[in-house]
Amino acid sequence: MTQAQATSISTTSLQIHTAPDDRLVYVLVNDPLARPLFEELAYEYSSRYAGLIDTDEIAREMQRYPVEAFAPPHGAFVLLLRDGQAIAGGAFMRHADPGTTEFKRIWASRNHRRQGLARRILTELEVNAVRLGYTRVFLSTGPRQPEAIALYQTNGYTLLSAHDFGEDQPPGYLFEKHL
């Protein structure tokens, strides 16, 4: 996808805004450029799930997958940099189901929200998943993340299940999309 194509993607109420020096880079999850993503995600999860999820559990979740899970040839980790700083990012890895990839850690910095950056990352992940031969995306998000739920619903993802805390199922919203 070219810069011009990325900046022209829109929905009825959201235009993707990019600065002239924005650039997408592929790195490993342990690259220092990725640190702000994980720090801000941990803060976000701690804020949204205070009293529901222990902070130690959040820290474990941030380290749950080995570096190789989000690396070629079966995955990738992309950051959107502005002025050399990560302002958005996301990853994908091979899922247990053949032909399926799982998207993880799709994020936009809280100082750069409502600019369509998460949508840009989502699109970039989809394009690269297709290049690697994946035909289906699976992803999950938490019940206290309405922005993520809306992002997936407005980008053609089908809701498979939705459960909140206190139900007899693990909490989370599960989605899929056939590429």
What are these model-derived regions, one by one?
Residues 17-104, 109-110, 122-124, 128, ...:
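Acetyl-CoA-dependent GNAT
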Residues 109-111, 115, 143:
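Active-site acidic-Proline motif in GNAT/NAT acetyltransferases
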